[in-house]
């Protein structure tokens, strides 16, 4: 059984949180709510996406367009290896982090079932998922 206020679906527990956080803070928050908790992961070819979309649609404020999910592009091993004209190496990480949309959210269009990539610093409501206690 899931804790009070959480919804059960195919052996996992889910909860929508309206408070807006950036992606990393939302992920940390989910891990503090329940043992094994994370921002929601969604199997693409399953009814889980409809369940989660429904959960968000029923609970989100009408003005909100996005809800974070637990997907983030990790590009650590693909650092660009360009060089400056004087031969010194370039690291783009400090530039890229702020300018590339690496974190994924559910998008309001079509009922929160489609994913969109956003800036990770953007603050959005989110869905946590955890195994039952």
Swiss-Prot record:
One of its GO terms (molecular function) is toxin activity. InterPro entries: C-type_lectin-like, C-type_lectin-like/link_sf, C-type_lectin/snaclec_domain, C-type_lectin_CS, CTDL_fold. Gene3D superfamilies: Mannose-Binding Protein A, subunit A. It comes from the Eukaryota. The keyword Metal-binding does not apply. GO terms for cellular component: extracellular region. Its main location: secreted. Heterodimer of subunits alpha and beta; disulfide-linked. Botrocetin and vWF form a soluble complex. Expressed by the venom gland. Belongs to the snaclec family. Coiled coil: none annotated. Is a standard reagent for testing vWF/platelet interactions and detection of the defects in von Willebrand disease and in GPIb-related disorders such as Bernard-Soulier syndrome. Keywords: Disulfide bond, Hemostasis impairing toxin, Platelet aggregation activating toxin, Secreted, Toxin. Snaclec that binds to von Willebrand factor (VWF) and induces its interaction with GPIbalpha (GP1BA) (via the vWF A1 domain), resulting in platelet aggregation. There are two distinct forms of the vWF-dependent platelet coagglutinin. The dimeric form (snaclec) is 34-fold more active than the metalloprotease botrocetin in promoting vWF binding to platelets. Pfam families: Lectin_C. It is found in: Secreted. Residues 9-129 form the C-type lectin domain. This is Snaclec botrocetin subunit alpha. Disulfide bonds join 2-13, 30-128, 103-120.
């Amino acid at each position: 059984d899931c804790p009070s206020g959480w919804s059960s679906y195919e052996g996992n527990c889910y909860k929508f949180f309206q408070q807006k956080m950036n992606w990393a803070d939302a992920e940390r928050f989910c891990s503090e709510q329940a043992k094994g908790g994370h921002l929601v992961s969604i199997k693409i070819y399953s009814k889980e996406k409809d369940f989660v979309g429904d959960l968000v649609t029923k609970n989100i404020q009408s003005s909100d367009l996005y809800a974070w999910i637990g997907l983030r592009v990790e590009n650590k091993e693909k650092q660009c290896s360009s060089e400056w004209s004087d031969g010194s190496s370039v690291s783009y990480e400090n530039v890229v982090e702020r300018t590339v949309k690496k974190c994924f959210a559910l998008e309001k269009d079509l009922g929160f079932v489609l994913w969109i990539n956003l800036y990770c610093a953007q603050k959005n409501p989110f869905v946590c998922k955890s195994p039952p206690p």
